[in-house]
A protein has these predicted regions:
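Basic, polyanion-binding surface patches
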Residues: 2-179
Length: 179
């Protein structure tokens, strides 16, 4: 049964696998979705794209519109592609793809052929963004803002301690990406 399902995924196009819904129709508990799952951030175009795993972020309203935010290290190749394309996707998967998601997080797409080696099937959305056929939920995001948090921006000592510990080297610095 698994092989048949996988074969069908590979043979179908985006419109056969996914349908557009409004953010209000998402039935997942958003805290569970973000806290208990890795997700994949993908940017680029059909000719060249890159993905990385994310493990923090959230969803809500920004400028009266549905928005997402994720945290990306400044040295990530995916961040370069987000800045270039001004769009990206966030995709969630069932647990059976965890090994492949960890593979996407294990090496840089700048220095490897991981997008060719990963056992997930790339798919272009109708908007021209890239994601994967095996995803169970895809968010298409238009870049709104990229910002760097400053230690003085945080009000609690717990947050300040976290940021001070997380940013010990320049390569550790992270950008907050809103879309």
């Amino acid at each position: 049964m698994e092989a048949i399902k996988r074969m069908n995924v590979e043979e179908n196009d985006f419109k056969q696998l996914f349908w557009q819904i409004s953010p209000k129709e998402i039935s997942d508990n958003m805290f569970t979705l973000v806290m208990d799952n890795f997700y994949v951030i993908t940017a680029g175009n059909e000719a060249h794209y890159n993905s990385m795993i994310g493990s923090g972020g959230g969803f809500g309203l920004l400028f009266r519109k549905p928005a997402s935010w994720c945290v990306i290290r400044t040295d990530r190749y995916t961040l370069e592609l987000i800045q270039k394309e001004q769009t990206y996707t966030i995709a969630y998967f069932s647990d059976r793809y965890k090994e492949q998601l960890l593979f996407l997080g294990s090496q840089s797409g700048r220095d490897s052929r991981k997008m060719e080696e990963v056992e997930l099937t790339g798919i272009q959305t109708p908007s021209g963004n890239m994601s994967f056929k095996e995803a169970r939920l895809i968010f298409e995001c238009k870049l709104t803002q990229i910002t760097t948090p400053d230690l003085d921006d945080f009000c609690t000592q717990e947050a300040r301690d976290y940021i001070a510990d997380a940013y010990q080297k320049a390569s550790d610095y992270r950008k907050y990406v809103f879309g």
